[in-house]
Design a protein with these regions (language model features):
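Pocket-edge structural micro-motifs
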Residues: 28, 44, 69, 78, ...
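Generic marker of residues within folded, mature protein domains
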Residues: 16, 32, 97, 124, ...
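Short glycine-rich loop/turn motifs
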Residues: 22-24, 62, 153
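A non-catalytic alpha/beta surface segment that caps or lines the substrate-entry region
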Residues: 1-38
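Short loop segments at secondary-structure junctions
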Residues: 29-32, 97, 159-162
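Active-site metal-coordination/substrate-binding segment of hydrolases
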Residues: 34-109, 113-115, 121-131
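Histidine/acidic-residue-rich, glycine-tolerant segments that coordinate divalent metal ions
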Residues: 26, 102-162
Length: 162
């Protein structure tokens, strides 16, 4: 995915960066007359939940997901579908490819969300320039996601003396 995203951005003449953690940033400049609008950051993650049935022989690193249509649903044979945040990635790619009036857009694709948010945790503070971020990873259709599904626990101790 990292190589695909890098090629996607570069082939369209968009500023594209891959950081040392493997996160990808593709920036789309504002359209004419919209340069003074605030930069909006859109974020999705590019990894998937790799689960399979015991009798399914698949190598998630090399083998394609076998899909089929069941009514109105796309499903996978013996594995998870691998579309956890695929819709978020697809929305970003459509915006990067689209011809519409817009302010500056930064599309951030983070890695390793499923295994501890290591992509987001490894991101440097200057990787993006925008001040507004919209996370495109949500569990339910038609709902806006306000915070992060991942997290960190902090335990602090304080000695109090009178």
């Amino acid at each position: 995915m990292i190589a695909f995203l890098k090629e996607f951005g570069e082939s369209r003449g968009l500023h594209t960066i891959v950081d040392e953690t493997g996160n990808v940033l593709i920036s789309k400049p504002a359209s004419k007359g919209m340069e003074n609008k605030p930069t909006v950051i859109l974020q999705s993650h590019i990894d998937m939940v790799c689960e399979k049935l015991p009798d399914c022989e698949i190598n998630f690193l090399n083998d394609p997901i076998q899909t089929y249509i069941d009514g109105d649903w796309m499903k996978a044979r013996g594995t998870t579908l691998g579309a956890d945040d695929g819709i978020g990635c697809a929305m970003q790619l459509a915006l990067l490819d689209g011809d519409f009036e817009h302010g500056p857009i930064e599309c951030v694709f983070t890695r390793d969300e499923e295994t501890g948010l290591t992509g987001a945790m490894g991101m440097k503070s200057d990787f993006m320039t925008g001040s507004m971020l919209i996370n495109l990873d949500s569990e339910d259709e038609g709902q806006i996601f306000v915070s992060c599904a991942g997290g960190i626990n902090t335990e602090a101790f304080l000695r109090y003396e009178k």
